[in-house]
Amino acid sequence: EFEEYLANHPFNQREHLTPKQWKKKLVKKDRPDLAWEQDFLMTMDPAIKTVPKERLFEAYQYAEELRASMPVNRDASWTEHGPSNVAGRSRAMMFDPNDFENKKFWAGSVSGGLWFTDDITVSNPTWIAVDGFWENIAISTMAYDPSNTLVFYVGTGEGWGNGGAVQGNGIFKTEDGGNSWTQLSSTMGDDTFDFIQKIVVDENGNIFAATRPGYWWGGNGGIYKSSDGGNSWAQVLTGSTDYPKGADIEIAADGALYASLGIFSTDGLFKSVNNGETWSQLNSESNGFPSDFERIEIACAPSDANIVYALCAGGS
């Protein structure tokens, strides 16, 4: 049964080339999906035909128990040797809404976790790391709830297909302004939430997340909505491809939602004026916006709800 499953798996339906043929045919861009393919085939459980992510968490907890039981030389002296002049990628940044002086600032690294400083205005701010032993530290997006500014949401996973991308594992939440955090069980161990490209929260506390699945054959990305603080989610925009990938979502000054799908395939730019219940596609060629873009990043002018910017990229 397992051999039949592998034979019919999408990976075995595509063209397989020799290394020499790959060099001639493979496009000149990062292809982490090929590494994900190999990783999937090496780590999947034949009995359930998928990767048992819940066991990874159990193994992590067991490793922590072993580490805690080992003797530690607390008198050891450490000296940092750097490098200290090279910054990693930071895709998530946010001024703390509870600091009316606009000094406290949050920043998330795609492979280095979540950090904050109490005073971003000084020339050399002191940065403090939030618990570095989160189940996942690939921080990709961050947002707060306008209806309760003590509530923050942090998404994980860098899903742009670059070679250094780190896969995520759902969304984290704080209800006390960042003092303590929990991982939303509704997003844990689910391929749909392996890469959270963007999170926004409207004035009523509704959460919208642009997601893409961890592997191109699994999960079901797109735009998801939660109206209960992240306890449950509903897909509100799926696009036109077999494996939809949410790229971005923004809220305009009048509350309208703008979302983009695609990333590695042409899908589109969409708008909703009823909290994500229905959507209209904007890149229809007839209005001057081309329909063949793959990745689309969006920005809405806070001063004018009628002004929307779209930064686009094609396959080449």
Regions found by a protein language model. Name each.
Residues 1-316:
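Extracellular glycan-interacting surfaces
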